[in-house]
UniProtKB/Swiss-Prot annotation:
This is Uncharacterized protein YxzF. It comes from Bacillus subtilis (strain 168).
Length: 52
């Protein structure tokens, strides 16, 4: 049981390292998507308000 736990921690560390490695690539893309979503949500809200 102890071995499994250690293996899980090792996998987690590996995952974190991978995330850190890819963060500069992924972060701007995610940020752009989030901005686009916020913008489209606000547009939809104002459009539905004027239509209703």
């Amino acid at each position: 049981m102890v071995e499994k736990k250690e293996g899980r921690i090792g996998a987690l560390k590996k995952m974190i390292k991978t995330v850190i490695k890819w963060a500069p690539v992924i972060y701007p893309i995610v940020r752009k998507i989030m901005k686009d979503r916020k913008a489209s949500k606000q547009k939809n809200m104002s459009a539905s308000r004027t239509a209703g």
